[in-house]
Amino acid sequence: MRIDDLTQRLRALGAKPAHEQRVLRAWVQRSSMDNRRQAAKDFLPLALREALPALTAELEGLARLRSQHPGEDGSARLLVELADGQTVESVLLLRDGLCVSTQLGCAVGCVFCMTGREGLLRQLGSAEIVAQVVLARSLRPVKKVVFMGMGEPAHNLDNVLEAIDLLGTAGGIGHKNLVFSTVGDYRVFERLPRQRVKPALALSLHTTRADLRAQLLPRAPQIAPQELVELGERYARSTGYPIQYQWTLIEGVNDSPEEMDGIVRLLRGKYALMNLIPYNSVPELEFRRPGREAAVALAAYLHRHGVLAKLRQSAGQDVEGGCGQLRARVVKMDRRPRTARATPPTA
């Protein structure tokens, strides 16, 4: 379901813009449709009031909690079941943050990512994206949403921008606390500056070498790292939000002194933050995370050379922390043949 479809249905029930906003705000913020001045029964059209119970049940069914996996760091990884029975992952982050998925699967095919191994199964509608926030708000407050879960937001741009617009208006989330994460796509840099709600931007860089980037992200748009940084810098200066560059640290792949010097050349003097994220090793893939001391040394090197850098850990690292790992494990278990129960012998 898309937000636009939802608003069209509300209008067909006689809703004016003020009625739409009352209903949407109550849904996204999990609040009452009554306010201090006027009860919903005295404000909403009769046809809309009569349709609300069924509509509310339908919205609640867009995203249901299948399982919750608390992490030792205070985060929690959520396996979310959609209305068609498919599952995606969301992650409750520290300091009232939430990471949401935008696609079921992913077409980019990052070689180090579990989500990309399945390819793209389907897009999530904008209402399904927002429903992950609504579900999370039933568990904790959510004041920041990062679009960094399963999927590539740039490949589902209309739905993601529609979700961002609702979250940044009726959802009550500050624009800079909505973070659009992408491997880089020219359409993103064309459309984001024109939006009513302009999110912060996170760019997945992972290497300063164009040839290695093409190997690691085989189906991403072939934008050279230097051009990607230039596009990011333009957006950062126009919005006043620094670009967050994402760098998954993989031992022996992109953790060399040459790569760190490349980061310095690209980012020194830029309105930017480099997030170094040690890779979450999984048995199915050959990549490995560098040691803690080595990762700390890399972040310190960047600091000394004028690049603001943070060493981050994937939230919920101890509970299938890499993107798509939890879903992959559950899908694998669901596909496992079930053993019939033995019938006890009769006397």
Curated annotation (Swiss-Prot):
InterPro entries: Aldolase_TIM (IPR013785), Methyltransferase_A (IPR040072), rRNA_lsu_MTrfase_RlmN/Cfr (IPR004383), rSAM (IPR007197). Signal peptide: none annotated. Belongs to the radical SAM superfamily. RlmN family. [4Fe-4S] cluster binds at C106, C110, C113. It comes from Azoarcus sp. (strain BH72). Its EC number is 2.1.1.-. One of its GO terms (biological process) is tRNA methylation. Residues 92-318 form the Radical SAM core domain. Its cofactor is [4Fe-4S] cluster. GO terms for molecular function: 4 iron, 4 sulfur cluster binding; metal ion binding; RNA methyltransferase activity. Disulfide bonds join C99-C323. Keywords: 4Fe-4S, Cytoplasm, Disulfide bond, Iron, Iron-sulfur, Metal-binding, Methyltransferase, S-adenosyl-L-methionine, Transferase. SUPFAM superfamilies: Radical SAM enzymes. It holds the Pfam family Radical_SAM. GO terms for cellular component: cytoplasm. Binds 1 [4Fe-4S] cluster. The cluster is coordinated with 3 cysteines and an exchangeable S-adenosyl-L-methionine. It is found in: Cytoplasm. This is Probable RNA methyltransferase azo0122. S-adenosyl-L-methionine binds at G151, E152, S181, S204, L205, H206, N280. The active site is at E89, C323.
